Design a protein with these regions (language model features):
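Helicase motor interdomain insertion/brace
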Residues: 1-174
């Protein structure tokens, strides 16, 4: 095509922000205020469970430092104690329980993977296969399933997607 986008189709997400999503933003913003960090909106829009996945980010380094500071530690622990949705539950992960995504985009991706059965596959079936597809690759629900391009300037995003999507696939496989 003239604009060189002939093979691309933009699909708008139909995922809505839920109250728990907003609550996680508000609580993460409270954490940021305690440590004197700026607004966390851009982080929050990009990934859930920021305190678990923000390795090598100044925000997480400041939170860790504040947890070791007697003056800030109490306020921070109070927020984290009242907001368990800010951190992944080790007990839930160990038990293989479903983990709330707290992110409309991630929730949509996980829903699409579950509904289509794509969690059973190591890769997306080819669009124009050389051979007849079999088993899970031939499932009617896989006909419309497509690869997703995810763009983000944050390094945390691929880590969150890989971790939580892999966990969800393993959970379904059990």
């Amino acid at each position: 095509s003239l604009d060189r986008n002939g093979m691309l189709t933009e699909v708008s997400g139909s995922d809505t922000t839920e109250s728990q999503d907003l609550l996680s933003y508000c609580d993460m913003q409270r954490v940021a205020r305690v440590i004197g960090a700026p607004d966390v909106l851009e982080y929050w829009k990009s990934a859930p469970y920021l305190l678990n996945f923000l390795d090598d980010y100044q925000l997480k380094d400041e939170v860790v430092k504040a947890l070791n500071d007697p003056q800030q530690s109490l306020a921070l622990r109070k927020i984290l104690g009242a907001a368990p949705h800010l951190l992944l539950s080790q007990a839930a992960v160990a038990a293989g329980k479903a983990i709330p995504s707290h992110s409309p985009r991630l929730r949509g991706l996980l829903r699409d993977m579950t509904e289509s059965g794509a969690w059973r596959l190591l890769w997306v079936p080819p669009t124009c296969p050389y051979y007849e597809l079999q088993d899970a690759f031939a499932a009617p629900t896989m006909k419309g399933f497509t690869k997703r391009l995810v763009f983000s300037s944050w390094r945390v995003v691929p880590k969150v997607i890989a971790s939580l999507v892999s966990y969800d696939a393993e959970r379904h496989a059990r």
